[in-house]
């Protein structure tokens, strides 16, 4: 068996490779990989995220998604599906079950074991700290089902404001009184000034964002 001849753009002459076969650098994303998708997928899920209802930070006023004026992508034909918290049969999706197991929940409602995929609709994703020291509340995270405290991949964390303090001024009246009629004094108060820019208020604290679909690789 001869050694293959390989030409590249860096040299004008062919050269022989020292490898019997050229290595494959990228074989594609692994099963269980999650990626943002800018297009519209079908079907659009309208079910409520029930995982967060188990937590103290459940939201209300949910609204079902609507179709945008854009093409619809049927991503499941390409091995991807929307991260919408659905249950799948382990016998039908053995590769994905081998990755997720019962991490996000499982049940035996039918003759076959079913496992749940993560539900990332309307959520921001954060890298698992894994001892990196960047998540000061890591020990208070909730497990992927929202039922118990657990610092694991897939765990949940409620929205919050960092603990802080604000100084403020107090006017303390003082005076000397003598025998005679009672004297009175008034206490002045101060308030914070108006913000330089009109403040934006909403039902949650959030950064600027763009809505995307999070997809998970199942085959």
Swiss-Prot record:
Residues 174-195 have a biased composition (Polar residues). The keyword Protein transport does not apply. It comes from the Bacteria. InterPro entries: Phage_tail_collar_dom (IPR011083), Phage_tail_collar_dom_sf (IPR037053). Pfam families: Collar. Coiled coil: none annotated. This is Protein RhiB. It comes from Rhizobium leguminosarum bv. viciae. The lineage of its organism: Bacteria, Pseudomonadati, Pseudomonadota, Alphaproteobacteria, Hyphomicrobiales.
